[in-house]
Regions:
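PP2C/PPM-type serine/threonine phosphatase catalytic domain
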Residues: 1-299
């Protein structure tokens, strides 16, 4: 049976920032991504009605040689798996496909490293949204949020050495936020420890009016959660909200590339699903009535 589409208003914006010589971030929105290098700023806007929406941010690791290449490999691998992504119907489907994409992208980056001798790596933060599930996964420190009428929730978990110290109880969240290790990634695309290559995964439900956000650490490192929440609480178009987040990060003197992907749920598909179920129920009821009448007539 054909799936039920949902409608999202989406905006993606990336900016090189004030201190970096090149932009090593990339984004992916339902098949659209930055397909060239030496990008200072880029944006994408759309209102899409799809059965499955896929959005992602890949932040190339600036301390390595070819971070932009690693980020490009991340988004092109998503593009190469478009058919599998569109076939997702459940959270289990999403998890299986996402982990396969992560392994494929990681393998491609390792092969590139072996071929060129240049070190590279990238974060990976992805959302899959459909009428039946909202699935999130991340490698590294790119963040994922959902803002609902009840508040804002972070769906990602930083995969950094500082976060590992927090998880072990060695330091507090506040101490980790000030530590050097907060930007040292423990997991990322391009790592050679394949046993540790496991993204953080989470899920949620979406409703009409919810706001979804994926951003690189050039934004999340300098903007506290209450500032992000204030921006996401606006009724303005999502492209304006995206611009506001970038502008806020610039005012905070973010020294990194900055990328945001924002989506507002315009139609969560639940009304259409209810109508379909009601139609099926009525069809079954009508069939039972007709069968009963036929049996009675034959008797």
């Amino acid at each position: 049976m054909k799936g039920i589409p949902i409608t999202l208003e989406i905006a993606a914006v990336t900016d090189i920032g004030r201190r970096r010589a090149r932009n090593e971030d990339n984004f992916f929105v339902n098949g659209a991504f930055i397909d060239h290098y030496k990008v200072r700023a880029e944006r994408f806007e759309s209102v899409d009605t799809e059965e499955v929406h896929v959005m992602a941010v890949c932040d190339g690791m600036g301390g390595l040689t070819d971070g932009d290449v690693a980020a490009m490999i991340g988004v092109t691998t998503l593009s190469d798996h478009a058919d599998e992504l569109q076939a997702i119907r459940t959270g289990e489907d999403a998890s299986f496909t996402a982990n396969r994409i992560v392994r494929t992208a990681n393998d491609r980056i390792l092969k590139r490293i072996k071929k060129t001798g240049k070190k590279m790596g990238s974060t990976f933060a992805m959302l899959v949204a459909s009428v039946d599930c909202l699935y999130a996964c991340n490698l590294g420190d790119s963040e994922i949020y959902i803002k609902t009428r009840f508040g804002m929730e972070r769906l990602s978990k930083p995969q950094t050495y500082a976060q590992e110290l927090v998880d072990s109880g060695a330091v507090s969240e506040n101490q980790a936020g000030r530590s050097y290790g907060r930007n040292q990634l423990s997991k990322y695309l391009g790592m050679d420890n394949l046993k540790a290559l496991k993204p953080n995964e989470s899920s949620a439900e979406i409703r009409t009016g919810d706001i979804l956000l994926i951003c690189s650490d050039g934004v999340s490192d300098v903007l506290p959660s209450h500032s992000i929440y204030a921006s996401l609480s606006s009724d303005r178009p999502v492209n304006e909200i995206a611009d506001t987040l970038i502008e806020k990060a610039l005012r905070k003197n973010s020294g990194d590339n900055m990328t945001v992907v924002i989506a507002r749920v315009l139609d969560d598909g639940r009304v259409a699903r209810l109508r379909r179920r009601l139609g099926i129920a009525l069809g079954i009821t009508a069939g039972v009535v007709m069968l009963t009448v036929m049996i009675a007539w034959m008797l």
